[in-house]
Amino acid sequence: MARIAVIGAGMGAMATAARLAVAGHRVTVYERGTTYGGAVGRYEREGFAFDTGPGLLHLPAVYRDLFVKTGKRPLETCVDMVQVNPAVRHVLPHHGIDVTLPGASHGGVATALESAFGAGAGERWNAVLGRARDAWDATRRPLLEEPLRPGARQSLGGDPYPALRRSGLLRRRPPTLAEMADRELGGALAEVLTGLVGEYGIDPATAPASAAVLPYMEQTFGSWYVRGGMRALATAVYERCLERKVAFAFGAEVREVLVRDGRAAGLLLADGSEAAADAVVCGIDPRQLPAGSLPWPPEAVPARGDGVPGRLTLLLALRGARPATAVHRTVVHAPGARVTVLRPDDPATRPDEEHEAVTVSAVTGPGTSEPAELLNLAEKAVQGLRERLLWHEVRTPADIEAATGAVGGAVPPPALAGAGGRMLRPANTTAVPGLYLAGGWAHPGGGLPHAGMTGALVAGLIVEGAEFRGSR
């Protein structure tokens, strides 16, 4: 039985802790804050409740596998998880388009797109997602289910999306997602694809075309909501950790990773005490630790996250019942800006049936850096929004940093193949024996499913060693 110290109580860190505890190790999680879940938070006021982090789960198989591998009770007995259908509504006011797409139905999506965007739109969309499926099939194992191997940055640096090649610029280099969407979809339909990718904090103008795997995953595996809010999923993972005898130390800020005899040997805490360990898992952005506290030079700190944007979020308390025709998720597209509006049909989010809780969020940038800008766009999705508004709360990147410690409130996106490897995350192993990286700032990147997968990868590397070949 090894002693494992885990830094942070985010979703990836807790997934790692639960898997290691099942393998027989003694695991302690050290969290600087007062609670678990990392970015998966919840805000409550006057009977209203809001998710302050991710509001939906894509690729739920990651958490189903976690619960199967760590206990007798499957995920569905621990949380009430429902597939969202319709999956998403797209509002493009500058084009006069308002279209609602069904969940996990390629045929249904194609039919809806044909109606909204004209003849051939559904066929073009399915062709793009078909090529995205090829990219998914080519990279699913090395990009999501296996540790990042030496040389992976070279092998995954090429874009696996089989874009339609044309003369000119695209002969000299692979297209960006925006270029691919413009060529293969065109016009307003291209904005739908780039908008879905942009929700992840990825810039379509610089991202590789392989980013189309993200809309492919959503459409193929569906979008899922946990009743009671996504915080209920974090609570379920936390409770599974407790069942497996994982210990949690809250208010325990880490000052330094201790290295003795050339390997990680524990943690130095802010109160001056030391926590000895046989292995250390860093489940946070390493930039959160004080400069010089890591056993490598500052310029070599992994997951620097340069240019990773944060989120601006509005929590809206509305008078009046949620309309029966309301769609759970709406993306409002505007020139140079987009917002996501979440309207869950969940009694746990509102004081009674005569009120509604709505969350509006956007990646910070031009057109989405001020609350008023978000509210203006959200009006396109929620009829009579301003007249119904009782009160609202604003969550800025600075608020996220204060709550979670994430530098600049940055929210890491999933790792992607292509772009010369610049959209990959650092490997789960490090140059220091016994020190591992988990969570959204490590391979395979951010987002609930990807961060959750770090649990399987890090646990496998610790339990099976360097010969571990990935999750099965």
Placement of each model-derived feature along the sequence:
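Extreme N-terminal leader/targeting segments of oxidoreductases
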Residues: 1-4, 23, 417, 467-470
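N-terminal glycine-rich phosphate/pyrophosphate-binding loop and immediately adjacent elements
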Residues: 2-142
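A conserved FAD-binding loop/helix module that cradles the flavin
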Residues: 54, 440-466
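Active-site/ligand-binding neighborhood in enzyme catalytic cores
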Residues: 133-244, 409-416
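A glycine-rich dinucleotide-binding beta-alpha-beta segment and adjacent secondary-structure elements
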Residues: 188-200, 384-444
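A conserved beta-strand/loop element that lines the FAD pocket in flavoprotein oxidoreductases
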Residues: 241-254
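Mid-domain catalytic core of redox enzymes
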Residues: 255-353
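C-terminal segments that line or cap access tunnels to active or ligand-binding sites in enzymes
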Residues: 314-403
